[in-house]
Each structure stands twice: as structure tokens, then as C-alpha cells.
């Protein structure tokens, strides 16, 4: 149990330094303007255009690799990226199991990680433990200790309510 965990629960975050690991899959958080401009991975862009992905707020599109395995995901931020700052909480409920990293986003990296952590919360005290869901690598540009403390505190407050 980490020093910031008040109630023992699985962490929604990948162990460090997962951000640079080859096993960590990218999430491109994009707006419709990013798709139009083609400002991210070419294969993911081609898949988004072929699938008609519009980057609506909270929309998710899984991107296959050439080998047919999962290669990443596109996450919509809505028009001009002006979305709710904690929209990444939806990623915690919609991404498949595995380790993920935010590859591109107009939302601050710490805000994306905090949103993901808060979205991963589940009250499970009287239930069977759920299977491990997706885990997010906290970006190096974000304050990991602060994010861990905040997610633990919010989780405790939710448990007490």
C-alpha cells in the first residue's frame, strides 16, 4: 500500500516508467481540427478517416496494428478541444485492459491523468474485486505524487459519502 492510499485498492495508474515502455499503448486525444490537419500518427489518422471518426467529445476508436493486434486508441475531445477538463475519466471505463499513455492532447497532461484516476473509481467494498482494467502511465510532465494523493483523497471521500 502506497503512503497516499488510505484504502487499499488497485491503482488506475501504470507503474513508472511505463510511459516509455514498448508495451504501453498510445491514446491520441484529438479534436476534429486535429483529424482535419492530420497532426498525429499516420496509420491512426488513416484508420480514423476510414471509420468516419468525428472526434466527438468522449468518443473512442480503437486502432488496430498491421498485425491485427491493438495498436492504440483515438479519444475525441470535441470541437476545438474545448471539453470538460476531466473527460479522460471516460477512458478509465471504455479502454480495454492494458497499460496506456497519453500520446497527444490539448488538455494538460496532469489534468488528463487526474481525470482518468477519478473516472476509475468504483465502490467495491462489498463486492467481488473487479478484474484489473486499463492503467494509465502518468506523463512525466505531470506531478505524479500530487495526482496519486488527489485520487486517493477523492476515493476516500466517495467511500464515506
Each PLM stretch: what is its role?
Residues 1-161:
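N-terminal hydrophobic/helix-forming segments and targeting peptides
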